Design a protein with these regions (language model features):
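Transmembrane alpha-helical segments of integral membrane proteins
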Residues: 108-112, 134-149
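Cytoplasmic-side transmembrane-helix entry/capping segments in multi-pass membrane proteins
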Residues: 7-18, 153-160
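Interfacial loop-to-transmembrane junctions
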Residues: 143-164
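Short alpha-helical packing/oligomerization segments
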Residues: 113-139
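Alpha-helical transmembrane segments
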Residues: 42-62
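Juxtamembrane boundary at the C-terminal end of a transmembrane helix
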Residues: 167-182
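Transmembrane alpha-helix boundary signature
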Residues: 1-11, 23-35
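Membrane-interface interhelical connector segments
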Residues: 67-89
Length: 182
């Protein structure tokens, strides 16, 4: 259950998703969809929630790496002393990863429902990097189950997966608005 001393991720995720939905802007170029379409709303909600959870997982993995390094070097002070034990922090990381992965999977599936013209809708960059991110997270979760991957391995895979996800969303926006529009 959520009785661990780690805060529930919904405290951060839900307001972040709401903010993203309020600030959403039309994608440059391509065909615009009716945003009142409930299926598209589900796609957006699933995708933004997955992104927020996986962003939290990336932050959690950085904290876990710092905590582990300070404990290993016997320099645990300040914030690290106030954190839950490593095992609890790692469990929280994988809870975020599993939930984010499920939502990312659903977001990708629902996204494919809206593809009319992959190139004209400027979806190639976003889709390719999202699928690479999905594969990285799938590999990490499989490695955890199959080989018991933990700590630094989990940190590296989490940050790699989130890096690809970041490239999918921020990178595609940069490519469309800066490189292609120039």
């Amino acid at each position: 259950g959520m009785r661990s001393p780690v805060a529930h991720p919904g405290i951060v995720v839900y307001p972040l998703v709401a903010l993203c939905l309020m600030l959403k802007v039309e994608a440059p170029g391509g065909s615009q969809r009716d945003l009142s379409d409930p299926a598209l709303e589900w796609h957006i909600l699933l995708s933004l929630t997955a992104y927020a959870l996986l962003a939290l997982a990336a932050m959690q993995s950085i904290i876990l790496a710092i905590q582990e390094k300070q404990l290993r070097n016997k320099h645990a002070g300040g914030l690290v002393r106030k954190l839950p034990p490593l095992q609890t922090m790692e469990k929280a990381l994988f809870q975020l990863l599993y939930t984010g992965f499920i939502l990312l999977t659903l977001g990708l599936i629902t996204g494919f429902l809206f593809v009319d013209d992959f190139i004209a809708q400027h979806l190639a960059h976003k889709t390719v990097f999202s699928i690479i991110a999905w594969l990285v997270f799938a590999g990490l979760l499989w490695g955890r189950k199959q080989y018991g991957w933990r700590s630094q391995t989990a940190v590296k895979w989490t940050l790699s997966g989130f890096g690809f996800l970041l490239l999918a969303y921020v990178g595609s926006k940069f490519v469309l608005e800066v490189l292609i529009q120039s």
